Regions:
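Short, solvent-exposed beta-strand edge segments and adjacent coil->beta transition regions
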Residues: 39, 103-107, 135-139
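Short alpha-helical functional segments enriched in proximate histidine and acidic residues
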Residues: 61, 84, 162
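Conserved PLP-binding catalytic core of the aspartate aminotransferase-like
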Residues: 75-126
């Protein structure tokens, strides 16, 4: 991503490469850099082939599964996660992510009453991958490509166990 206020400023220091050179003069080898304007002027060179092989494999997975299928599963997984969290009661957990699936992705941000980063650390120790945001938000994102409904269930069970053991 290159912000538009920087995209056309050719005086800014940057890494430059083959792909940021003007296509019309690129092969003339004049010894001077003829930078493209806009975000294209920030491109580097060809990516390493081994890195691209891994990216190709991951893109193949997305194509095999299908984006529409991922979206459907994502909505169901996140809806299930939301349902399970609401069973804990809003006096314990507040979901601050919009409830409308059209206004969110797979991530739910939650606030847990009287919790701090210790709760996040305990979830991490229990094998849950989540994200902590000050002052009191834990973000969890059941990802449809590799998370299951059982994963979501186990996450909430671990959360309940940690909350029950907390003073």
């Amino acid at each position: 991503f290159v912000h538009e206020r920087h995209a056309h400023n050719k005086d800014l220091n940057r890494f430059t490469g083959w792909w940021s050179h003007n296509k019309k003069t690129r092969f003339k080898m004049r010894g001077e850099f003829d930078q493209l304007s806009g975000a294209e002027g920030w491109q580097l060179s060809n990516p390493p082939i081994l890195s691209m092989a891994a990216i190709k494999a991951s893109l193949d997975m997305f194509q095999d599964v299908g984006i529409e299928n991922l979206i459907k599963k994502s909505r169901k997984l996140t809806g299930y996660f939301e349902f399970l969290l609401k069973q804990l009661g809003e006096d314990t957990i507040k979901i601050i992510t919009p409830s409308n699936p059209d206004e969110r992705g797979c991530q739910l941000s939650i606030q847990v009453k009287n919790a701090n980063k210790t709760l996040h650390d305990k979830l991490t120790a229990a094998g849950v991958i989540s994200d902590w945001r000050e002052p009191d938000v834990i973000r969890c994102a059941p990802t449809p490509l590799y998370n299951s409904f059982e994963d979501v269930y186990r996450l909430v069970e671990k959360l309940k166990k940690i909350l029950k053991a907390s003073p």
